[in-house]
């Protein structure tokens, strides 16, 4: 039998079938989706860690304010007292916002730190008092 006229050899020489191409595209799509989900989860975790770290750093600035002013700023004064204290130099140039663009919340005495104060972020949902709030208290 002549190799040029063999239908099996001609089919193999033409390349992949439509079904094979669809399977490869589907597999690429599944891998891309899995990687995308993993990246988004890491992004959210990074934002939560950033918010927690910022809350702790703001808390350290509040402690410094206490040393300079013989007491914590009132809840009414809020965190703006760190940038505009009643006496002395500002402790912070400006108070940062959380990773989601919201202001940090300052409460004295705190709900979590009852003998001190709470500095907290509303978290990714932007709702105060929900489960995703993070602040200057130990993780539960």
State the predicted function of each range.
Residues 60-140:
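Low-complexity, acidic interaction segments enriched in glycine
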Residues 1-16:
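N-terminal leader/signal peptides at the extreme start of proteins
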Residues 16-17, 56, 109:
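Domain-level signal for compact, non-enzymatic binding modules
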Residues 17-26, 47, 74, 93:
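Conserved coupling/switch loop of ABC ATPases
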Residues 12-39:
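N-terminal single-pass transmembrane signal-anchor helix
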Residues 10, 35-84:
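Conserved hydrophobic/amphipathic alpha-helical signal-anchor segments
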Residues 27, 51, 87-88:
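Amphipathic alpha-helical protein-protein interaction surfaces
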């Amino acid at each position: 039998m002549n190799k040029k006229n063999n239908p099996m050899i001609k089919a193999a020489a033409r390349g992949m079938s439509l079904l094979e191409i669809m399977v490869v595209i589907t597999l690429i799509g599944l891998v891309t989706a899995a990687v995308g989900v993993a990246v988004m989860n890491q992004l959210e975790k990074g934002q939560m860690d950033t918010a927690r770290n910022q809350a702790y750093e703001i808390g350290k600035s509040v402690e410094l304010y206490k040393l300079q002013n013989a007491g914590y700023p009132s809840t009414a004064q809020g965190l703006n007292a760190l940038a505009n204290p009643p006496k002395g130099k500002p402790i912070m140039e400006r108070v940062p916002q959380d990773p989601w663009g919201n202001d940090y919340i300052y409460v004295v005495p705190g709900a979590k730190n009852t003998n001190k104060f709470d500095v907290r972020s509303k978290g990714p949902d932007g709702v105060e008092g929900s489960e995703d709030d993070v602040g200057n208290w130990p993780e539960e």
